[in-house]
């Protein structure tokens, strides 16, 4: 509350943040993250289906596990945040028939959290902002 109290859209966004924290029990960080992702996505009109990776084989780790998940979903492209560019080898994905791309936001505010952006820009502007991106290799 103190960090965002002076932001332009605080009065509109903060009640939603309170809802997220009040609805969620102490079961796990990943469960809370999924709750937040779904709730904020709904508010922004994002209809992408999300799934837990728990149901997939845990035989591999890291990049190999992502490739396994992509293959089991018959995905021909994997998109990651641009901050992960140094983590993955595009050639390894390519050899499995999967394009590896990174999402580069048009606003160049890659260091800000979604809460930072919502507090500064509000739901409507953020909804438009998330549509402005470039997929890079």
Task: List the predicted regions and their residue ranges.
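Residues lining hydrophobic/aromatic ligand-binding pockets adjacent to catalytic sites
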Residues: 1-137
């Amino acid at each position: 509350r103190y960090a965002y109290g002076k932001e332009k859209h605080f009065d509109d966004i903060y009640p939603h943040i309170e809802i997220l924290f009040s609805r969620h029990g102490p079961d796990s960080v990943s469960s809370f993250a999924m709750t937040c992702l779904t709730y904020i996505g709904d508010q922004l009109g994002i209809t992408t289906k999300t799934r837990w990776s728990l149901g997939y084989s845990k035989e591999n780790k890291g990049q190999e596990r992502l490739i396994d998940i992509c293959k089991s979903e018959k995905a021909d492209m994997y998109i990651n945040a641009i901050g992960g560019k140094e983590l993955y080898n595009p050639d390894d994905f390519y050899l499995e028939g999967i394009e590896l791309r990174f999402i580069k936001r048009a606003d160049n505010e890659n260091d800000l959290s979604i809460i930072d952006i919502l507090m500064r820009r509000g739901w409507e502007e953020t909804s438009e902002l998330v549509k402005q991106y470039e997929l890079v290799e």
